[in-house]
Amino acid sequence: MSFSARMALCLAALAACSAPAVAEPLRAIYSIRGGGLQVMQVEAVFELDQPARYSIRAQWRTTGMARLFGGAEFSGGTEGRFVGGEARPTRYAVEGTWRGERRQTVLDYPGGQPVLRVRLPPDNDGREPVSEAMMRGTIDQFSAVAQLSRMIATNGRCDGQAGIYEGVRVVRMQARTAGRDRIFPWSTAWTGEATRCSFTCQQVAGFKADDDARVREPQEGTAWMASPRPGAPPIPVRVEVPSRLFGSLTVYLMEVDGVAANALASNAGSSDARSATGAPPAASRAP
């Protein structure tokens, strides 16, 4: 899986759903780190308060040494409806630059099925075309995690699956509940107890001719979900995915509504947590 695809996977993990009484957007800043350095920053706005509607918007850009592998700066998001507990996107749009080249994708969903309205560059970077049959029934990556998170908000579990298509490739994603963990403190990142969701993603369409066999292999990751502050909906507070360039990538929730995330954790500083000076393993199993 390419570096940009792994960034999308990280981003795919940065969304959640719940139903608090007051409909207020939740603004979050995430740091994505690999090899001990920040490689990307993400600013996200979650509007997940309505029982039947959702909207997720984000801006993300590569930082530091990651720019050596190709600078990227993007913005966009999705909006949609919940039908029977399932996310049904109505529009997905992302635009920005990758290695100095303009990129844009717009998907609409008439009749609930994805239709690619805009794709730049039009040659799709030399990838094989994705057939309508492979697109059928898919949703975008933000909506996929919104659906997963709605299940967590409803029953405390994250067991589910989805086909993800963002205009380039099709990925099958399956998630499963893996218990509860204590998130280790690091810098100003959120710390506390969270639900652990293990997930598997496997690309099944949209390959390049020169992709090696590893691109087709299942990729395992973990997302830890929790309410970042009292009264807020649960969102990803830490995420880990593998990376060929950096070994692994870790996503840290650093700020919520303009406040350092570690200052908002309702159970931060408890006897189960410990301090750290570097980027530690994400969590330890809760007793």
Predicted regions and their residues:
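Cleavable N-terminal signal peptides
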Residues: C10-L11, A21
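Bacterial N-terminal signal peptides that target proteins for export
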Residues: M1-L9
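Acidic, serine/threonine-rich low-complexity disordered tracts
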Residues: E24-G111, T154-P287
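A charged, solvent-exposed segment within the mature domains of Sec-exported extracytoplasmic proteins
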Residues: G112-G179
